[in-house]
Regions:
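Extended, highly charged
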Residues: 1-265
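A short, hydrophobic C-terminal helix/tail in secreted or cell-surface proteins
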Residues: 266-270
Length: 270
């Protein structure tokens, strides 16, 4: 199922009684993480903190959602399946179609053709993530949690990090835990064997990076999937959502990012 935006998925959780709203202020340092930890361990619902309190005592303008995919049922709901192996079966049918069956009954191949067409991303001029442009961004004002006492600081735990090969321009989207170092500085935890690290190593100068927040479920799951090199995360997101993923160009660099994001930070890797 193509959710298109995270807001649609969160609304579906609320409609089905799977979302807990917390209207009172909750600290992003440790307190919010404690709520989420207890919910995960007891198979509880997703939780939305409407007034996340930042370390300086102020209330963030943005809410904080946690435990969105914390149960098997919610994960299946996010992916639009009853069983996760449905996705694998669809992949197999695309890679090894029943040619004989299609020749005998050509109409049975229509669904397969539509499935394949859904994988090609669609470029659009503007996305939701560009409706408001902040000229002087400060990531410390975002409701980024510190979830464990011994953590080195506050971390974005579900960031969609987009990079490109400096020679071929081929994009990669990975989910790399990002530590807040300052108002305009994040530390990206990409291991040596990840494509993001490959792109950084191959770059002789500052490398453009897009750090994206609040993507729809099909994009989040695609970003963490171990895909072959000839299948992009954007194509796989289209397969998961059964609909072409809309992508748009960043404002300050040439990277293409999902258009339905809540927040995108155009950055550079040093």
């Amino acid at each position: 199922m193509a959710w298109r935006t995270l807001a649609r998925y969160v609304q579906s959780l609320e409609d089905s009684g799977e979302l807990i709203r917390v209207a009172d202020p909750v600290d992003v340092e440790l307190e919010a993480g404690c709520f989420a930890d207890r919910l995960v361990k007891r198979g509880g619902g997703a939780i939305l903190f409407e007034q996340p309190r930042l370390p300086d005592g102020s209330i963030s303008d943005l809410p904080l959602a946690m435990n969105l995919f914390g149960t098997r049922d919610r994960t299946n709901h996010a992916l639009g399946v009853k069983r996760p192996d449905e996705i694998g079966n669809r992949m197999v049918s695309l890679m090894k179609p029943d040619i004989g069956g299609i020749m005998k009954a050509p109409w049975t191949g229509i669904g397969l053709a539509l499935e394949g067409m859904s994988m090609a991303p669609m470029k659009v001029r503007k996305g939701a993530c560009q409706q408001i442009v902040i000229k002087d961004p400060d990531v410390t004002k975002l409701p980024i949690p510190k979830t464990w006492p011994e953590d080195g600081g506050r971390y974005i735990t579900l960031p969609l990090v987009v990079t490109a090969d400096p020679e071929t321009g081929v994009h990669n989207m990975g989910m790399y835990r990002s530590q807040v170092f300052g108002p305009k500085e994040l530390g990206l935890h990409w291991q040596a064997h990840k494509h993001g690290a490959d792109h950084a190593d191959a770059s002789k100068d500052r490398m453009p990076v897009a750090i994206c927040l609040g993507g729809p479920p099909e994009v989040m799951f695609s970003s963490i999937s171990p895909l072959p090199d000839n299948l992009s995360e954007y194509e796989f997101a289209g397969l998961l959502g059964k609909r072409r993923l809309r992508i748009t160009k960043c404002i300050t660099n040439e990277l293409m990012v999902p258009a339905g994001l809540l927040y995108t930070s155009d950055a550079a890797d040093d």
